[in-house]
Amino acid sequence: MSRGPSSAVLPSALGSRKLGPRSLSCLSDLDGGVALEPRACRPPGSPGRAPPPTPAPSGCDPRLRPIILRRARSLPSSPERRQKAAGAPGAACRPGCSQKLRVRFADALGLELAQVKVFNAGDDPSVPLHVLSRLAINSDLCCSSQDLEFTLHCLVPDFPPPVEAADFGERLQRQLVCLERVTCSDLGISGTVRVCNVAFEKQVAVRYTFSGWRSTHEAVARWRGPAGPEGTEDVFTFGFPVPPFLLELGSRVHFAVRYQVAGAEYWDNNDHRDYSLTCRNHALHMPRGECEESWIHFI
């Protein structure tokens, strides 16, 4: 008669044996004959001895081969890979190490070895007039023993200084903005504007053109300080550059002044005629002795 798993009878020896707490001394006895080599502790990432080499596989195991093959040294590296290697944190050579320099030609990277530019000998170079005038000054200064006389192209205002007019105060009260004076130099055109102090927040700008108002530009003026009795007026300064091609005889610059305050806009355009400057010849005379001791060579 067969018995199921629940009816299995254990030996009496196992049933009468009591299990006590397991002692770990037996494990220590097993390792007692093996002397462990002490290991030195060091923080991770610190320099030290290299790890021991991996033991070679046994004769039964097949020899392992790397999946990724190393690139041949004769192959040129791509520009992207070379840039990444140059920008890597560890790419810089440390002191005392030797770094070999390699030369690569443009054709190895798919580029052209030469760049050809064709010039037509019949085309005359376009030299600005102000450059030619300065070259003529230097040649006259070196080859002549007489006094130096030359002409320069410069912008000259077509109007007298408004601040010197007798009705300047009346115009200022009527327009709330009025141009004081304007000056020209190699750096461009600059000037001052006076406005009535209507409110604290205000803005002054100069709108100018080199093409007869076909295209316009604006230069924002900066506050310089108060003026007038008890600070009822303010003075602003402005400036804008002049391109070299404009320094030709007859070329003109037109501009007007705009004043924005308290949500309103006011203009000073020289009584609807605009302020203008014209490029004209300006004659200069300088004795020979003063030329040799001056900075005329650097004009």
Swiss-Prot record:
Composition-biased stretches (Pro residues): 44-56
UniProt-recorded Gene Ontology molecular function terms: glycogen binding; protein phosphatase 1 binding; protein serine/threonine phosphatase activity
GO-annotated biological processes: glycogen metabolic process; regulation of glycogen biosynthetic process; regulation of glycogen catabolic process
Region span, Disordered: 1-22, 37-94
Keywords, ordered alphabetically: Carbohydrate metabolism, Glycogen metabolism, Phosphoprotein
Domain (CBM21) ranges: 169-278
Transmembrane spans: none
Bias (Low complexity) ranges: 57-67, 85-94
Domain of life of the native organism: Eukaryota
Assembly: Interacts with PPP1CC catalytic subunit of PP1, and associates with glycogen. Interacts with EPM2A; in the presence of NHLC1/malin the interaction leads to PPP1R3D ubiquitination and autophagic degradation.
Role this protein plays: Seems to act as a glycogen-targeting subunit for PP1. PP1 is essential for cell division, and participates in the regulation of glycogen metabolism, muscle contractility and protein synthesis.
Domain notes: The CBM21 domain is known to be involved in the localization to glycogen and is characteristic of some regulatory subunit of phosphatase complexes.
Name of the protein this chain belongs to: Protein phosphatase 1 regulatory subunit 3D
Gene: PPP1R3D
